[in-house]
Design a protein with these regions (language model features):
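The N-lobe alphaC helix and its flanking beta3-alphaC-beta4 segment of protein kinase-like domains
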Residues: 54-72
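Protein kinase-like catalytic core scaffold
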Residues: 40, 75, 89, 145-148
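Conserved hydrophobic core/spine positions of the Hanks-type protein kinase catalytic domain
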Residues: 115-122
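ATP-binding glycine-rich loop module of kinase domains
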Residues: 18-60
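Conserved structural core of kinase catalytic domains
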Residues: 55, 74-113
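Juxta-kinase regulatory segment immediately upstream of eukaryotic protein kinase catalytic domains
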Residues: 1-19
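C-lobe/activation-segment region of protein kinase-like
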Residues: 125-129, 140-160
Length: 160
């Protein structure tokens, strides 16, 4: 995939208009997209090298991680559709500011740290870590969402 932002992407034959690039992560590009009625996050898996992380089957990993976190009870956007062939995921769009942006604007509340700690309690009891980078958390209506699906087996050096 080139660095140009696509104007349209499909998921299992359904077309979505791309509004903007939300971000690029280790495993893919996340776009704000619309079907004309609702807004979604449409993630396109990429295969660009990452010097500090080894991937297997990225699209299957996303699905497995989503199901693992859902079972644990982590507050996150719903996976609405997955297109295995084109390596695309359609997610619920959680509108709000990232913790990263809130830190920059000095708008972080102690309740958000408490919500992360509550997530950690669930995660650690299930031998799981998530990616705690501040751009992976969005606040909507005072609720903190983990918007990435990445998770791994618990390792002390990666805990919160």
């Amino acid at each position: 995939m080139s660095n140009a932002i696509p104007t349209e992407l499909s998921v299992n034959g359904k077309n979505y208009s791309v509004i903007k690039l939300l971000g690029k992560g280790k495993g893919g590009y996340s776009y704000l997209a619309s079907d004309g009625t609702n807004q979604y996050v449409l993630k396109q898996i990429h295969h660009e090298p990452c010097s500090y992380y080894q991937f297997g089957d990225k699209i299957q990993s996303e699905l497995n991680d989503y199901n693992r976190l859902k079972k644990i009870g982590i507050t996150m956007p719903k996976m609405l559709d997955i297109d295995i062939e084109n390596e695309r995921i359609l997610k619920e769009y959680i509108e709000g500011d990232t913790i990263f942006d809130m830190v920059k604007a000095d708008r972080v509340k102690s309740e958000y740290a408490e919500q992360v700690k509550a997530m950690c309690k669930l995660l650690y009891a299930n031998n799981t870590n998530i990616d705690y980078f501040p751009t992976n958390f969005v606040v909507q209506n005072e609720t903190l969402y983990y918007i990435d699906y990445e998770c791994n087996d618990y390792m002390e050096e990666w805990n919160f």
